[in-house]
Curated annotation (Swiss-Prot):
The active site is at K95 (proton donor). PROSITE patterns: OMPDECASE. GO terms for molecular function: orotidine-5'-phosphate decarboxylase activity. This is Orotidine 5'-phosphate decarboxylase. It comes from the Bacteria. Transmembrane segments: none annotated. Its EC number is 4.1.1.23. Belongs to the OMP decarboxylase family. Type 2 subfamily. GO terms for biological process: 'de novo' pyrimidine nucleobase biosynthetic process; 'de novo' UMP biosynthetic process. Keywords: Decarboxylase, Lyase, Pyrimidine biosynthesis.
Length: 271
């Protein structure tokens, strides 16, 4: 099944636009897992089991695994999600961007080694740096557009031909880059006016929206700005607020409570 089909099915089946980010910080893992073999996998698996029926996607951040030499645990985690919850797509948050020959190997890493359903990429080096990902025709390619960090404005708001760079990225994604029909854009919840502008430009293209929860993005403003006519179109990501709702042995139950509340709050404003 193609990424966009998986995503649409998950929106409907779980009645959810919530994406849970899997960013396992060893310094914040529960004491019961500290020092145990495979602690990162065990933590993430418990979060996945507690929230899988509440989400439209999971988004592991590769750096949190690679910095701990835990790439094998990332492989194990994605394999587990696919086996236990085959209807939930996995987005590898890698934000790769390099020349075509190198990008071919990053694409193999994402889609062949890790078996992710989608990957985040940077458009800074242009279309040829994204083509190797798009060659995997069933896989999602989610392009950084208007990011949630404050420093994103340094480049994304520079003007070219009378409009900011982030709008040009959205236009190129709509008109030129989306050769597989599986492209999406990253637009931060911290900037709802820009979400609305991107939605206007790209139509029904899926948007990955980080920045709610710990980053303080407003859920109502985000949903109203980014929803499509049928009340979908978004993967609204929350990571830390869910993962670290508790650092005690009840961490998975606490994560479920926060995920459920977040999903239900999102759903208040979908229609």
């Amino acid at each position: 099944m193609r990424f966009t089909e998986q995503l649409a099915a998950a929106w409907q089946r779980n009645n959810s636009l919530l994406c849970v980010g899997l960013d396992p910080d060893p310094a914040r893992l529960p004491a019961s897992l500290t020092g145990t073999g495979g602690a990162i996998f065990s933590f993430c698996r418990a979060i996945v089991d507690a929230t899988a029926d509440l989400v439209c996607a999971f988004k592991p951040q590769i750096a949190y695994f690679a910095s701990q030499r835990a790439e094998d645990q990332l492989e194990q985690l994605i394999s587990y999600i696919h086996e236990a919850y085959p209807g939930v797509p996995v987005i590898l948050d890698a934000k790769r961007g390099d020349i075509g020959s190198t990008a071919e190997h990053y694409a193999k890493e994402a889609f062949e080694r890790y078996q992710a359903d989608a990957v985040t990429v940077s458009p800074y080096m242009g279309f040829d740096s994204m083509q190797p990902y798009l060659a995997h025709a069933d896989k999602g390619v989610i392009v950084l557009c208007r990011t949630s960090n404050a420093g994103g404005s340094d480049v994304q708001f520079l003007e070219t031909d009378g409009r900011p760079v982030y709008q040009v990225v959205a236009e190129r994604a709509r008109d030129v880059w989306n050769t597989s029909g599986q492209m999406g854009l990253v637009v931060g919840a911290t900037f709802p006016e820009e979400i609305a502008k991107v939605r206007e430009i790209v139509g029904d293209m899926p948007l990955l929206i980080p920045g709610v929860g710990a980053q303080g993005g407003d859920i109502e403003a985000t949903v109203r700005a980014g929803r499509t006519a049928d009340g979908t179109g978004m993967m609204i990501n929350s990571s830390r607020a869910i993962l670290y709702a508790s650092t005690d042995s009840d961490f998975a139950d606490a994560a479920r409570r926060v995920a459920l509340a977040t999903r239900d709050q999102i759903n208040q404003f979908r229609n």
